[in-house]
């Protein structure tokens, strides 16, 4: 009997070990999952096991809604906290997760042998770097190379990922994983190449060609007595290998902004962003942005923020393995939020975006909150609304291929000021490609309730089911968007797009800040509550024209016949509140008190 007893003991011990081993293996829960490969992408081979990926992990914020309410309050004239912008450390402390939450997440990373030197913790965000093979074990997934059909860009991504149950409730997202979209320039193709007319001819015919002088006349922009102020830095965003060329800038200022020839800009590199001066690549977007932002702003201190992060992220045979992220928004935003308060730009103009549906909702929420954090610190965030009208294809990418108007992100974020487009000058009209509509991710903020509701009442039942009437409406304002003269690689071009509208409006905001600072007032910061409180005073209401979209392929056939948002009296989702009247806006801006 002894051998049998011994055998039973061994079996019992083995079973116990198996049970304990199973208990030691944590159960996992899915954080994010895509039903299928997003439209426009092709799945290729498994990602190289040794490829390094830098991840950004966002923890859920218990006080996010409270914080965003506070940002709106401090930006609303008449509120007791108006103009009381927060300091960097105050924002961090307000949003810092409970210590036990951070400890739990960091403990999980350490238990997965994530190199301690790669872990950086910033409030509710954690960055870490691991090879693909380790990421697959940590996140219970497989990474593959995916190629974009149109651009041939290759990215390492997955369709789903999971984390242990005991940390699942704390994690909002980990990227790059399921986010496939990349920002695109909001720029129409150049209308022609070659040498345009002389400056005198251009100034005499602003209905066909736009220069800084045309815009100054159209929007009543005049010079003020304000001197350059380090508190009023005007920033321009650069992504996707767009290089702001100094020679082109100087030539442009000499030809089209003769009173600004002493103006220049500095360059800040984020995530190894470049600003090559000898590249043969087109830089029309960068040229457009810096040439109009700094020719229209009066003696502004200008900074071009060039951010790296463009693919491909799978190296060719024989190339060095680089750390890949392809998350330029997050890289830029975290860089800016880490800056001391005195080094932040007062205004930041960005002319990039993508279909909102291409952005995971967790990503858009987390990113929008970062924009709100900049607003809390007194930064005015300006985005072009996009160049796809009511939507490019108007087909959802969730596997159902439902017909729907498609909003644009980040323009749809309630904490940015989105700028739509116009054309012509007597009168100005909505331009057909100006993106606008209603967000499917963000509810309508209270500051625009009255304005947007008025439009919806005019619209009635038209387009029911094709949009979200409760969503954040955009754009907020508009400006000219076509026939802009730029100089790129020494060649004079005309270009268009809401890429042009954003730096124009940003320059006007910079001027408003200059006037306020000169009068001893604070920067405007997050603009939208103030803009909507004006009831369109200070804006030309655009009531002619409208947007279009939903085109099938390259033809003029529309998936939704006559798909359009019309420009109407009051706010509309093509031109927002209208185009600026600087002379009125500067008086309004300097009459709103928020003293230091």
UniProtKB/Swiss-Prot annotation:
Needed co-factor(s): Ca(2+)
EC number: 3.4.14.10
Chain residues that bind Ca(2+): 541-542, 570, 572
Active site per UniProt: 285 (charge relay system), 289 (charge relay system), 499 (charge relay system)
Predominant subcellular localization, coarse grouping: secreted
The record's free-text note on cofactor binding: Binds 1 Ca(2+) ion per subunit.
Positions of the pro-segment in this chain: 17-201
CDD domains registered for this protein in UniProt: Peptidases_S53, Pro-peptidase_S53
Catalysed reaction, written as an equation: Release of an N-terminal tripeptide from a polypeptide
Protein name: Tripeptidyl-peptidase sed3
Species whose genome carries this gene: Aspergillus fumigatus (strain ATCC MYA-4609 / CBS 101355 / FGSC A1100 / Af293)
Taxon lineage: Eukaryota, Fungi, Dikarya, Ascomycota, Pezizomycotina
Gene name linked to the record: sed3
